[in-house]
């Protein structure tokens, strides 16, 4: 059938093909021990559809027994409108989240609330992340990297301080959680240091 045929322009056929290909690639990634990164939350560009980035749309994939060996990372932890969905999805055994992009889009104070919510649910599944790209001609990725790293660390400190102040964790546990978010969780997920 020619590529330009009307059959390939049918949304239902394209959707079925996309679903098949995604699940095939996800299964192979699991077999190879490679986490699958899925963009969730806000995005840029006229091609972007906000409702398509709701992580709750992944629930059938995340519940698929054939994909249990595949780890999924919800990039941006649902940034903005969908962060609460990401929190709930972390209860799945093979789902992780990073809070990248939120470091750039929202204030450090608001980010600290998001980080605290994530830590109170499943701290062993939360990872630091940035979202480095040249946003404007005036600001390059180096500046964005510095800024997002600073805001991430400050938000993490505010979240952990609040948890200590509220009696949820000790200072020792706060230090442990900080190390987990900034290093250990990613090292475990990606197998850093294993040979």
Predicted regions and their residues:
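Catalytic pocket-lining loop regions of alpha/beta-barrel enzymes
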Residues: 3-128, 136-138
């Amino acid at each position: 059938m020619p590529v330009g045929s009307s059959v390939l322009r049918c949304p239902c056929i394209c959707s079925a093909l996309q679903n098949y290909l995604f699940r095939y690639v996800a299964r192979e990634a699991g077999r190879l021990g490679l986490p699958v990164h899925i963009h969730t939350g806000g995005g840029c560009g006229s091609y972007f559809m906000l409702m398509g980035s709701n992580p709750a749309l992944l629930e059938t994939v995340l519940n698929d027994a054939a994909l249990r060996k595949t780890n999924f990372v919800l990039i941006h932890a649902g940034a903005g409108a969908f962060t609460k969905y990401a929190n709930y999805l972390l209860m799945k055994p093979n789902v992780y989240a990073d809070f990248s992009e939120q470091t750039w889009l929202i204030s450090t104070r608001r980010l600290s609330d998001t980080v605290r919510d994530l830590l109170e649910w499943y701290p062993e599944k939360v990872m630091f992340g940035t979202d480095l790209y040249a946003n404007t001609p005036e600001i390059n990725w180096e500046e964005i990297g510095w800024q997002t790293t600073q805001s991430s660390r400050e938000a993490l400190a505010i979240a952990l301080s609040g948890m200590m102040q509220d009696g949820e964790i000790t200072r020792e546990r706060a230090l442990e959680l900080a190390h987990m978010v900034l290093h250990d969780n990613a090292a475990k997920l990606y197998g850093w240091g294993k040979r």
